[in-house]
């Protein structure tokens, strides 16, 4: 799932086609009706009305476009979902909705979610485990509670102390 919900969707494709594209690549043997059924199910799972099936990305809000990206990423039932700053381009109320949605689909699809972010308050509130990177290298890895309560590396300590966090630990 990408950071820019608009930029990650082909503006010439309908929402249904965007979501079904991975099926065209990895499950070519499916009939059109089967693909449509899978797309509509994925849309429902992310809170999108099937009335959006034949619409285009420019007709949707940023939050709806991000839900399209999430539906597209779920269409082939992955075991791992990589989210690259998936809420940073969204306003706060939509951020909360998308984060709640990710939590729901994590359980429903039995997913491991790799959540890439610089926003420590979000990391603190949704992640079970945190890996801190500096210049592409891992400087610390721990469960979220321990990492925020007792960071070991100097870099992690500086990182945590540089950003006030209003969200308490889980």
Segment roles from a protein language model:
Residues 33-51, 160-161:
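Conserved ABC ATPase "signature" region
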Residues 56-60, 64:
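Conserved ABC ATPase signature
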Residues 70, 98:
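Hydrophobic anchor residue at the start of the ABC signature
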Residues 141-142, 150:
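ABC ATPase "signature
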């Amino acid at each position: 799932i990408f950071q820019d919900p608009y930029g990650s969707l082909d503006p010439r494709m309908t929402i249904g086609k965007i979501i079904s594209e991975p099926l065209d690549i990895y499950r070519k043997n499916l009939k059109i009706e089967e693909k449509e059924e899978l797309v509509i199910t994925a849309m429902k799972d992310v809170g999108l009305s099937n009335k959006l099936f034949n619409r285009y990305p420019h007709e949707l809000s940023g939050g709806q476009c991000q839900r399209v990206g999430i539906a597209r990423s779920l269409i082939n039932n992955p075991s791992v979902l990589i989210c690259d700053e998936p809420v940073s381009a969204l306003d706060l109320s939509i951020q909360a909705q998308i984060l709640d949605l990710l939590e729901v689909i994590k359980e429903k699809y039995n997913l491991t979610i790799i959540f890439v972010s610089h926003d420590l308050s979000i990391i603190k509130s949704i992640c079970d485990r945190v890996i801190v990177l500096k210049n592409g290298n891992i400087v610390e890895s721990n469960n979220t509670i321990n990492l925020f309560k007792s960071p070991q590396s100097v870099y992690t300590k500086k990182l945590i102390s540089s950003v006030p966090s209003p969200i308490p630990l889980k």
